């Protein structure tokens, strides 16, 4: 009986520790990792509740200049961001929104097969240990630290400062813009509605959440 109690206690301790790592923003608060767009947003806005939020993909990152705006919205633009990302952030309580939510929508933010950034924390499975989920970032830092230590160097990793979201600069002529739109129309505009069903369903959940 004591062995069973001990095993249960160990399992619970591991589960609680993993949960703490998941939600304590360990990587967000460290300068030794390259942060993704969500982590950069968290780093700039450590407050528990974001009163006004502007969500979208890279279009929002580039178009809404938070530091030059007086509107007070948190720029939650994410590279490869889709509506299901926003819903998972809300549902899994990775963000808390106060009074306003603005969503920048286009066909890519609603496209179910659009590739995503696998390091976003809401992609972590419930049964997946945090250290394993972040293995691609932890492993190189640990092995590099050991190599430096063996060579008599300081094992401290390189600091990645400062870190900003990538902004896509550039301009197109009318002809180039027209050609680009034609390409997008050929690739996306005639897709069946099933290709957007998951994100549309997530949008409905977000609307219901806001209405509540």
Where are these regions (language model features)?
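Hydrophobic membrane-insertion alpha-helices, especially the h-region
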Residues: 2-25
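Extended hydrophobic/aromatic segments used for targeting, binding, or gating
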Residues: 13, 207-212
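Alpha-helical transmembrane signal-anchor/signal-peptide segments
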Residues: 23-46
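Short, flexible loop segments at the rims of nucleotide/cofactor-binding pockets, characterized by
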Residues: 28-35, 76-81, 193-196
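A generic local structural motif
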Residues: 37-42, 87-89, 203-204
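Membrane-embedded segments
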Residues: 54, 59-138
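Secreted/periplasmic serine-hydrolase-like ester/acetyl group-modifying domain
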Residues: 105, 114-209
